[in-house]
Swiss-Prot record:
Keywords: Calcium, Copper, Metal-binding, Oxidoreductase. This is Formylglycine-generating enzyme. Changing C277S: Abolished formylglycine-generating enzyme activity. The keyword Calcium applies. One of its GO terms (molecular function) is formylglycine-generating oxidase activity. The catalytic copper is required to activate oxygen and catalyze oxidative C-H activation. Ca(2+) binds at N194, I195, D208, H210. Its EC number is 1.8.3.7.
């Protein structure tokens, strides 16, 4: 699960001007009807993964992968965008990967001591001042808030997916399954996603090949051609979060509650383990405040289906 960083003292500045809309790097999905929610009864009650309910979506486009460090760097270079983590001056880093002077270690999160608030941690320095993203251009960008993700999407001529679009896309055409590839976590003894193995939060055996983030085209894509819809990094959705929303959700193209305190997160991350998180299931939900950031928060973009490819933004 992600953890909130304290809110910046100043309000976020207006985002960049919207670019012409683009479907570059995206897969077109036909839409249609699907059963949304947890059919296995494995979710946390407070997450509101039930009742399973029928949703019907119009066709839409969605990114094949999470947004990478390289793509986010292009956005920052073009716009001068300053992330919420940079504005506040610190962000949440998992305790085993902190790379910062002792003076930059500002303390742990209440109830989640494995999360350390690190001065100077942000998307360019994801583990702290002694880290950088050299050699990681194709890893998902992290330490990005919902506000940052929305600003990027606007610049790229895209938008964030709705929660319903995200789950439909993540399922890869499989109905009623636990994961994007079926019901077994490791079919044939092979890992299909980047999550925690070992004893959380102190021992990660990295059987899946990764201790932290993995390149965005690791493992296999799902049936829709989307990569890493389970694990690696949490992905922001456009919706406000409510644990009771599924009981009142409209059937056609739901967009979430009209207001709220937190935005929806989907997909789980490299820190998910069944003893702690278990949110790499395709129906799993989480949430965080729009200005929160951490070393396992990222995003991918979506768009309407009546568009043609073409923006030069990326």
């Amino acid at each position: 699960m992600a953890v909130a960083a304290p809110s910046p003292a100043a309000a976020a500045e207006p985002g960049p001007a919207a670019r012409p809309r683009s479907t570059r790097g995206q897969v077109r999905l036909p839409g249609g009807e699907f059963a949304m929610g947890d059919a296995f009864g494995e979710g946390y009650p407070a997450d509101g993964e039930t009742p399973v309910h029928t949703v019907r979506l119009r066709p839409f486009h969605i990114d094949e992968t999470a947004v990478t460090n390289a793509r986010f760097a292009a956005f920052v270079k073009a716009t001068g965008h300053v992330t919420d983590a940079e504005r506040f001056g610190s962000s949440a880093v998992f305790h085993l990967v902190v790379a910062a002077p002792d003076a930059d270690v500002l303390g742990s999160a209440a109830g989640a001591p494995w999360w350390i608030n690190v001065r100077g941690a942000h998307w360019r320095r994801p583990e702290g001042a002694r880290s950088d993203i050299t050699g990681r251009p194709n890893h998902p960008v992290v330490h990005v808030s919902w506000n940052d993700a929305t600003a990027y999407a606007r610049w790229a001529g895209k938008r964030l997916p709705t929660e319903a679009e995200w789950e439909y896309a993540a399922r890869g055409g499989l109905a009623g399954r636990r994961y994007a590839w079926g019901d077994e976590l490791t079919p044939g003894g092979r890992w299909r996603c980047n999550i925690w193995q070992g004893r959380f939060p102190h021992v990660n055996t990295a059987e899946d090949g990764h201790l932290s983030t993995a390149p965005v085209k690791s493992y296999r894509p799902n049936g829709h051609g989307l990569w890493n819809t389970a694990g690696n990094v949490w992905e922001w959705c456009s919706d406000w979060f409510s644990p009771t929303y599924y009981a009142e959700s409209p059937t056609v193209d739901p967009h979430g509650p009209g207001t709220g305190a937190a935005r929806v997160l989907r997909g789980g991350s490299y820190l998910c383990h069944d003893s702690y998180c278990n949110r790499y299931r395709v129906a799993a939900r989480s949430s965080n405040t729009p200005d929160s950031s951490s070393g396992n928060l990222g995003f991918r973009c979506a768009n309407d289906a009546d568009l043609t490819s073409g923006s030069a933004a990326e």
